[in-house]
Amino acid sequence: MAKGGKSPKGKKITLNVAKNCIKITFDGRKRLDLSKMGITTFPKCILRLNEIDELDLSRNMIRKIPDSISKFQNLRWLDLHSNYIDKLPESIGQMTSLLFLNVSNNRLTTNGLPVELNQLKNIRTVNLGLNHLDSVPTTLGALKELHEVGLHDNLLTSIPAGISKLPKLKKLNVKRNPFPKPDESDMFVDSIKRLENLYLVEEKDLCSSCLQKCQQARDKLNKIRSMAPSAPRKAIFSNLVSPNSTAKESQEEWSV
């Protein structure tokens, strides 16, 4: 802590510095990488680079994200993990091109998540792990394109059934929350393994071609089951960044 109780000044990011931090990803996207630079205040100069596709401000000391972040209308990928953020701005709902949002390892509470998050209709991945959420934001239930959700290492005691009904949800991490029943998180994750429709009929009620298709599907399912490894299950959310408070490079330590 600096003299007088003030937070230490972080590295000053100028427009030229930011321009030099723009990288081209393997798929041709423009990524502005300002991670691990000791930044304490959101650098407003980067708003002039609103043509970028991806923004990485992770592993800094940022406390507040300004409303003006919505100027990044083309942004598809936003990584803010491992900062000191306790609230997201309402304007984040205007960033409708977002596909990926990582705000893990911050100081977010449920009240710090604006209802405007439900406007992110295209978002596929949201990581809210390692925060202070005591309930699941109801806004998540409106995000029908969600494939992956991280809620691990929070203060959750229950998960709304509506989350498991998200039509495209494939991966959910709710580990290390204070659920009343120790196995509740596993039971909830298992509920995502859904069947669109299930009908019980007898063989005599099926035509020969339908019966053949059912038998083929059954054989395929049995084959998949026989190939399943008997070893302990691996991380169901290991591809999302969720570092600890010291922002270590190795994410293996945080796999679940």
From Swiss-Prot:
Keywords: Cytoplasm, Leucine-rich repeat, Repeat. It is found in: Cytoplasm. InterPro entries: Leu-rich_rpt, Leu-rich_rpt_typical-subtyp, LRR_dom_sf, LRR_domain-containing, LRR_R13L4/SHOC2-like. GO terms for biological process: intracellular signal transduction. One of its GO terms (cellular component) is cytoplasm. Gene3D superfamilies: Ribonuclease Inhibitor (3.80.10.10). Its main location: cytoplasm. May be involved in the regulation of spermatogenesis and sperm maturation. This is Leucine-rich repeat-containing protein 18. It comes from Rattus norvegicus (Rat). The lineage of its organism: Eukaryota, Metazoa, Chordata, Craniata, Vertebrata.
